[in-house]
């Protein structure tokens, strides 16, 4: 796959959710370095064209600590990001009729892939608040795999988190590279964004999770709101591998 294929922009005025939900999907190529089958695709809806990332269910490798259906967790991550207003996950939808069957379809983030969380944290202080928002998301979602390379800056200057399939486990599994804010008070804006989840989960998210995962998510929100600070990794072991 050429670099040109990775960077072709979407057409002007394309609504991401609309084209992802109803566009025709055509595989462009397989994404390198992915543990599961992950494809760059072209999505066409009338005169509109966009790039997206397609993760079919049939391309998932079995995991001992997660059930099958990681593509649904990719969708759930976007739903959580959207309903809370944290807006750290690119638009992602469930498609039942992709080229390789059912799977998730996520808006492709055009980015400088040489830049990732570690470099961005050092060079882009203006992104630190967005990193805090992503940290809150990862805590609530119980993200087990927030690698540095999963943090990308799009053309709009927004920080996006990709590869969110390993989220929402009932057992505490948080592994992330975002620990620099440990011990800091969490801004009221961020706490207020997730606080409503303590009492009620939107149907669009609850439908993607098991009952014990819903209970655990609400407990994480309650703990976070009660403590009001970013957690500290006292062990130094709660990092994903590889780091990038």
Residue locations for each model-derived region?
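Phosphate/dinucleotide-binding and metal-coordinating scaffold of catalytic cores
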Residues: 1-244
């Amino acid at each position: 796959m050429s670099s040109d294929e990775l960077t072709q922009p979407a057409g002007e005025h394309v609504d991401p959710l609309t084209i992802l939900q109803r566009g025709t999907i055509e595989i462009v190529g397989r994404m390198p370095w992915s543990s599961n089958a992950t494809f760059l695709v072209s999505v066409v809806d009338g005169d509109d064209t966009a790039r997206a990332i397609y993760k079919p269910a049939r391309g998932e490798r079995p995991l001992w600590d997660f059930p099958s259906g990681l593509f649904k967790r990719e969708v759930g991550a976007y739903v959580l990001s959207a309903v809370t207003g944290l807006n750290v996950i690119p638009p992602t939808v469930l498609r039942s009729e992709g080229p390789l069957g059912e799977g998730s379809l996520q808006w492709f983030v055009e980015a400088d892939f040489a830049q990732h969380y570690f470099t961005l944290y050092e060079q882009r202080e203006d992104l630190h608040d967005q990193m805090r928002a992503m940290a809150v998301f990862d805590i609530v979602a119980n993200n087990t795999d927030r690698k540095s390379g999963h943090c990308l800056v799009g053309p709009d200057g927004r920080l996006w988190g990709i590869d969110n399939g390993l989220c929402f486990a009932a057992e505490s599994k948080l592994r992330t590279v975002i620990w620099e804010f440990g011990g800091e008070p969490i801004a009221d804006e961020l706490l207020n964004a997730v606080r409503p989840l303590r009492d009620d989960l939107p149907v669009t998210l609850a439908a993607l999770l098991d009952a014990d995962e819903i209970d655990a998510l609400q407990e994480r929100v309650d703990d976070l709101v009660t403590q009001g600070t970013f957690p500290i990794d006292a062990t130094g072991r709660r990092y994903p591998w590889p780091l990038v």
